[in-house]
Design a protein with these regions (language model features):
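Conserved P-loop NTPase "ATPase switch" module shared by AAA+ and STAND
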Residues: 142-169
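The start of beta-strands in P-loop NTPase/AAA+ ATPase cores
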Residues: 14, 65-67, 146-147
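Mid-core helix/loop region of P-loop NTP-binding domains shared across ATPases and GTPases
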Residues: 98-149
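Asp/Glu-centered strand-loop micro-motifs enriched in Gly/Pro and often flanked by an aromatic residue
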Residues: 1-20, 74-79, 122-126, 130, ...
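Short secondary-structure boundary/capping segments
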Residues: 35, 85-88, 162-169
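P-loop NTPase motor core
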Residues: 1, 38-101
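Flexible beta-alpha connector loops of hexameric P-loop NTPases
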Residues: 76, 120-124, 161-169
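Walker A/P-loop-proximal flanking segment of P-loop NTPase domains
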Residues: 1-38, 46-56
Length: 170
């Protein structure tokens, strides 16, 4: 089934939130969207992945338009709340660092340097939200646009609320 035709519908709304039961392909859809909208996806990759599909025949104006940050919170949903906080911080920081490398941003752990260069991503190993904030500032300073995808956004909360580690992994 070719579901790429729905990409056009996504572009008509500024924010999307997919709330389907487990095993409905939400993670696959986030990967499709990340690849479709990513500036870093080459024409060859695009043709290989989307060739013959509706979206390849009729691409939208925003294809390849964004710098994409794709966060998957399922990687941080294990262990105690303290363990999950540490894993979530590490995951967000790792993805921000990978984003910086992918799109050619400079990264620094020097707060003074980061404060004077808006195009620099400041890496704070203990404060992923600050790292993420400086990533957003750097993207904006370059005149780029960010497409943020958060997969399994509820996994962390479900584990914390249910106070157990055996939450369905799908």
């Amino acid at each position: 089934v070719d579901n790429t035709k729905y990409i056009r519908e996504f572009e008509e709304t500024p924010f999307q939130c997919f709330t389907r039961p487990p095993r409905w392909g939400k993670s696959l859809l986030t990967q499709i969207l990340a690849t479709y909208y990513d500036k870093a996806t080459t024409s060859e990759q695009y043709g290989t992945l989307f060739g013959g599909l509706d979206i390849h025949k009729n691409p939208t104006k925003l294809r390849g338009h964004f710098q994409v940050l794709n966060l998957d919170f399922s990687k941080a949903a294990t262990g105690s709340v303290e363990d999950m906080n540490a894993l979530l911080t590490e995951h967000i920081n790792d993805e921000c660092l990978a984003f910086g490398g992918k799109y050619g941003y400079n990264i620094s752990t020097d707060m003074i340097e980061a404060a004077t260069d808006p195009e620099l991503i400041y890496h704070d190993e203990n404060d992923a939200m600050f790292t993420l904030k400086t990533l957003g500032t750097a993207v904006h300073a370059r005149g780029e646009e960010l497409y943020l995808i958060v997969d399994e956004y509820d996994r962390y909360a479900n584990v914390c609320l249910l106070d157990r580690e055996d939450v369905d992994q799908d």
